[in-house]
């Protein structure tokens, strides 16, 4: 199953989490805005690459672009960002399950990116995001490994 992650979904989640943190925290925190998107996109690539390494053995192919074109101001997230992955043991997933896996990958990139960005300014928030990313990664790994086992156990009729 090949998935193209949606950069806008990732940045929307980053901005939403940042806004919710500012709105609900007793402490004052700086809001992440679209002005920081060029830097965030660099970190998004880094986090995506980390995920691909962490999923080694479960990834068939991956594709990542190397850089953004020269940003125009005001900067927006409509400039394509290539974050593609082909997952092993996933061809039998229903369309709904494929969308769920895609959304979880986008969530892991968003949580990892914002967690990385918040490390110095809000260590508790950063740890919380990293813990959520790790939990989602573990769940995805388990899902792909269980599906591989189910595929291996199916009887074959090659006659």
Model-derived features: where do they sit?
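Conserved short "hinge" loops at termini or chain/domain junctions
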Residues: 1-98, 139-159
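Short helix/strand-capping connector loops at secondary-structure junctions
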Residues: 23-27, 113-118
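Generic detector of ordered secondary-structure context
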Residues: 39, 105-106, 125
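Elongated alpha-helical scaffolds
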Residues: 103-116
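Mixed-charge, glycine-accented linear interaction segment located at domain edges/termini
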Residues: 116, 121-122, 138
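Short conserved catalytic/interaction loops centered on acidic-Pro-aromatic/His motifs
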Residues: 122-132
């Amino acid at each position: 199953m090949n998935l193209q992650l949606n950069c806008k979904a990732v940045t929307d989640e980053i901005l939403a989490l940042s806004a919710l943190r500012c709105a609900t925290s007793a402490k004052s925190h700086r809001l992440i805005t679209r002005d920081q998107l060029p830097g965030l996109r660099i970190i998004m690539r880094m986090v995506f690459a980390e995920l691909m390494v962490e999923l080694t053995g479960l990834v068939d192919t991956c594709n990542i672009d190397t850089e953004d074109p020269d940003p125009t101001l005001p900067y927006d997230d409509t400039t394509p960002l290539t974050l593609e992955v082909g997952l092993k043991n996933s061809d039998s997933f229903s369309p709904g399950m494929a969308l769920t896996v895609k959304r979880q990958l986008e969530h892991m990139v968003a949580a990892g990116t914002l967690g990385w960005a918040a490390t110095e300014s809000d260590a508790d928030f950063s740890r919380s995001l990293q813990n959520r990313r790790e939990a989602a990664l573990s769940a995805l790994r388990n899902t792909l490994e269980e599906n591989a086992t189910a595929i291996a156990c199916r009887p074959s009729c090659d006659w």
